[in-house]
Structure formats: structure tokens, C-alpha cells
Amino acid sequence: NNEKPSIKKLGLNCYESAFFTKKVVDKMIFSYAIKISVFIIIYIILMIKSINIELLLVITQTLFSAEVLFYFIKLCYYKFQLDKICKEFQDIFFIRGLSNDNANVLLLNITMDYECLKSFCKIASSSKIFFKNNKEWSEEWTNLLKKIK
């Protein structure tokens, strides 16, 4: 982002961060949902078969521990809030435009919402997913940036 220091530059930097974070979280939530689904399927099979009570107990403790379920719920919340924030940035940059009287106020508000969301959720984005998809997402971001300027 080659903008001179301004609220627009702050908004663009935050939008870029939210854009990439949303892309990573979308993939993270999918893989985490698959892991939980596998646990649940194994759990149901073991409950029906009642073969190995010790394994069933370990899976029960893992699957239903507050940490695993809470993390998944928090990840879902994070995803939905990121979707909302990215739509708000799109609204300002593509629909309302930066010439709108309230554009700076709206950009600051969305930027604060994004920073507060990151602070509240405390979810680290997967660098593995990011680096694997960075080229494709960077091209997509560059195309978006061209439409904004």
C-alpha cells in the first residue's frame, strides 16, 4: 500500500490484514470441523460397539473438554465477525466511497472493531495455511486494491 500516511492508508492496511486473516480462518475452520467430525464419528462407533471403554473415555475427555469445544465456537465467532468486518470495508471502499463525509469515521470504527476482535478472540492464524495460499490470495488482494484506487 503506497498511500501517504492517512486514515485511508490505515483503513487499507487494516482491510488487507482482515482480508488475509479471513482467508486463513476460512481454511482453519474447515480443517478443524473435519477433525471434530472424525472424533464424533469414532465416538459414536465406539459407543455403539462398546468395545474399548478406555479409548471411549479418552475421546470423551478430548472431545468434550471445554478447550476443544470453546476453541471451535470461538473460531466460528471469529469467522463470522471477520466476514462482517470485510463486508463493512467493502461497503466503504466500493459502495459509499471515500468521498463520503463519514468515510474517515467509518474507517476508524471498522479498524477498531477489527483490532478489538483480534484482541478478544486471541486466535493465531495458521502460517502454514497462509504461506501455502499466499500467492493466490496476494493476486486477489492486488486486484481488489486496483479497484479501490
Identify the function of each model-found stretch.
Residues F19-K22, D26, I42, Q90-F93:
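Regular secondary-structure segments
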Residues C14-S17, I40, I85-E88:
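Amphipathic, well-ordered alpha-helical segments in soluble domains
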Residues T21, T60-T62, T111, T142:
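Residue-identity detector for threonine
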